Structures are given as structure tokens and as C-alpha cells.
């Protein structure tokens, strides 16, 4: 019997995906937050979940190790989206990609045309495109976490990072100075899988589409 595999990451995306899965009649048999299993069955024998790092979701789907996945727009921009069909913005895990600096830093002066600043981020492609559009020279420093520390210790003038409430920025004496893009999670589908397994995948797409909240 044909089957489909859905790639998900732990945490907020998984929790906010549960109502969408329920709308498609899919119930996981384990909770990845409490289980060490990386492959999780469901109440439907033809559907299984694989638990991956958020940044790896597009790669699993691109190469067909998973037929579908749910990934943030930020991750998809960095990945490039090659080989992926992106039919739905699920409107979950919403936040924004923004530029933040130390309070008191003159960002307007630093970002005049011809200016040059140093920016720490894990979103290299997004940051590069944003500052290139402003006609700026920018030195990008790749970090994987604790972005807020970089301006405080002189590693960078600014950071590009995801922001939800802004409380972490405020706690570290930083402030948002520019929005780059609104971010939410998207359903992604392997293009070959959509052709070969449409009878299994299309009902999931339809159920998800009907359950998306504005």
C-alpha cells in the first residue's frame, strides 16, 4: 500500500500543526516532546511523521525522504525552495524577520548609501538581499544562536533575527529598527510525490486549506 511521510520539527510548529492534522483525520501516536522517537506513526497506517530540525525540513522534502513538510518562510528563503511545491501558507508560527541594534546606535546614519556595517545573523541570504537592496556594503557574520549578544560585545553593529514579542530584545537593551519580512509556516510538497501520490496527498492539502485560520 502506498504511504506518505510528513516532516515536522519539534516545538511551536508541531504544536500549531496538530489542529491541521486533526482536520485531515490524522492523530500522532506519540508526542515528540516526550518521546525519543524520530519516526512517529499515526492513527492512519498510510501516514507517518518524521521529526527533523526545522532547518532540515526542506532538504528532506526536496530529496523525497519526506513527501510533505511544514517549514517557516525564513527557512525556505535560506534553502532556496528548489524542487519544492509550496501550495499553502498555513498562517501558523507567525513572527517577523527584522533588523535590531543596541539602543542609542545611529542606524540611520550607518545605513546611508555607501555605508558599511557588520551584521550577525543565521539568515545570511535574507540579510544579504535586504542590505543589497539598500545599496549598502555589509559584513555578514554567521551565528547559530544568542544573536542578541553580538551587538553587546562589539561583534556586530546589528543583527537580523526572528522576533515574536520583542521581549528578548528589550531584556538585552536592543531595539527593532527595520522589518524585513513577515514570517509564517508553509506546507511544502515534493513535486514528484505530488504526481505519484496525489490520491493520498490531495485530501491532506484540501483539509489543511479548510482549517487555516485567518
Swiss-Prot record:
Catalytic activity: 1-(5-phospho-beta-D-ribosyl)-ATP + diphosphate = 5-phospho-alpha-D-ribose 1-diphosphate + ATP
Location in or out of the cell: Cytoplasm
Keywords: Amino-acid biosynthesis, ATP-binding, Cytoplasm, Glycosyltransferase, Histidine biosynthesis, Nucleotide-binding, Transferase
Organism this protein belongs to: Azoarcus sp. (strain BH72)
Broad class of the protein's primary localization: cytoplasm
Protein's gene: hisG
Annotated function: Catalyzes the condensation of ATP and 5-phosphoribose 1-diphosphate to form N'-(5'-phosphoribosyl)-ATP (PR-ATP). Has a crucial role in the pathway because the rate of histidine biosynthesis seems to be controlled primarily by regulation of HisG enzymatic activity.
Domain commentary: Lacks the C-terminal regulatory region which is replaced by HisZ.
EC id: 2.4.2.17
Subunit structure: Heteromultimer composed of HisG and HisZ subunits.
GO cellular component annotations of the record: cytoplasm
Protein name: ATP phosphoribosyltransferase
